[in-house]
């Protein structure tokens, strides 16, 4: 009798869990009553013939975050669930989370430094108003170019300023000058010097990383000639605030860096919260270099990219 019950319970379990039969359909198929089907399914679970495993993606996310915090010495690592490894989808999910994080984090009296780029603009578009007092929002790098490619630099900082009930502090300059001497002369302007100093004093910095791929935004803005692009592609893995670094996080071209205006990478290490929002397979090396250089102490990343970092790229 026990053997017959075992076989019947297994058959009922197969129909229920593998073939999606209802208990009534199983009863008709096996010529038994519906209550008997229910008892057989319970028996199958008790005997271990059926093992139900609930996959909680968020449990894995917490573990990934802890590993990243330890590996890179981060204050916080937030791993955001994104259904697919598609870059556009990842950016959408990270941007929503980034906006929520900023809404929760910014408090009265904070100075918030903001970069620009596709990810930053999407975060800005997701920002919700927050009643805070005395907050300053400052642009961390220049955003003017000769190209028709829109950086949305002005729109980005405007949206952040509106969210925190303040006026935006623009840095109305090219991010990369043709000549380092001209850049140094411009930096001496009283207004420009004050904006750059405010970016340096910001206790919160929000930024992403760029790549050195052909389609990288900075490569499409007309700042670099072909020789400079080739150099950056060969030596760099990415950029933060238009300052290029190698796999170890070191500045890879002092000549180009000297022409770049805005926050210095070393200043990001001194922030109360230096927040990097980035994800996607194309940015794995860039993120690794940025974290190795200790330019961020808070990371917002998707689980696909997080696993690549945990598995050493």
From Swiss-Prot:
Function: Negative regulator of the dra-nupC-pdp operon. DeoR binds cooperatively to the operator DNA, which consists of a palindrome and a direct repeat sequence located 3' to the palindrome.
Subunit structure: Homooctamer.
Family that this chain belongs to: Belongs to the SorC transcriptional regulatory family.
Taxonomy, superkingdom: Bacteria
Organism: Bacillus subtilis (strain 168)
Record bears the keyword Iron: no
Any GO BP: regulation of DNA-templated transcription initiation
Keyword DNA-binding: yes
SUPFAM superfamilies: NagB/RpiA/CoA transferase-like (SSF100950), Sigma3 and sigma4 domains of RNA polymerase sigma factors (SSF88659)
DNA-binding region as annotated in the record: 23-42
Alphabetical list of InterPro entries matching this protein: NagB/RpiA_transferase-like, RNA_pol_sigma_r3/r4-like, SorC_transcr_regulators, Sugar-bd_dom_put
Name used for this protein in its record: Deoxyribonucleoside regulator
GO MF, any single term: cis-regulatory region sequence-specific DNA binding
Keywords: DNA-binding, Repressor, Transcription, Transcription regulation
Family matches, as Gene3D superfamilies: 3.40.50.1360, Homeodomain-like
Comment field (misc): Deoxyribose-5-phosphate is most likely the effector that modulates binding of DeoR to DNA.
């Amino acid at each position: 009798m026990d053997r017959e019950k075992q076989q019947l319970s297994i058959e009922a379990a197969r129909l229920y869990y593998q073939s999606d039969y209802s208990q009534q359909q199983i009863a008709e198929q096996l010529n038994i009553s519906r209550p008997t089907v229910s008892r057989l399914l319970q028996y199958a679970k008790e005997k271990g013939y059926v093992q139900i495993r609930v996959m909680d993606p968020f449990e894995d996310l917490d573990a990934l975050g802890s590993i990243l915090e330890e590996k890179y010495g981060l204050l916080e690592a937030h791993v955001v669930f994104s259904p697919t490894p598609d870059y556009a989808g990842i950016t959408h999910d990270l941007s929503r989370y980034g906006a929520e994080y900023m809404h929760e984090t910014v408090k009265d009296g904070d100075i918030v430094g903001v970069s620009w780029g596709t990810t930053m603009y999407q975060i800005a578009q997701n920002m919700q108003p927050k009643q805070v007092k005395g907050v300053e929002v400052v642009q961390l790098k220049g955003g003017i170019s000769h190209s028709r490619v829109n950086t949305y630099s002005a729109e980005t900082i405007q949206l952040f300023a509106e969210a925190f009930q303040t006026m935006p502090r623009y840095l109305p300059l090219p991010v990369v000058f043709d000549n380092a001497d001209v850049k140094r002369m411009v930096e001496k302007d009283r207004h420009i010097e004050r904006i750059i100093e405010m970016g340096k004093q910001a206790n919160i910095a929000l930024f992403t990383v760029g790549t050195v791929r052909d389609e990288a935004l900075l490569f499409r803005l007309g700042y670099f000639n072909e020789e400079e692009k080739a150099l950056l592609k060969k030596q760099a893995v990415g950029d933060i605030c238009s300052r290029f670094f190698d796999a170890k996080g070191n500045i890879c071209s002092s000549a180009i860096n000297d022409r770049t205006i805005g926050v210095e990478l070393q200043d990001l290490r001194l922030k109360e919260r230096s927040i990097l929002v980035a994800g996607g397979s194309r940015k794995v090396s860039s993120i690794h270099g940025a974290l190795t250089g200790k330019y961020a102490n808070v990371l917002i990343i998707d689980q696909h990219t997080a696993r690549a970092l945990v598995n050493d790229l």
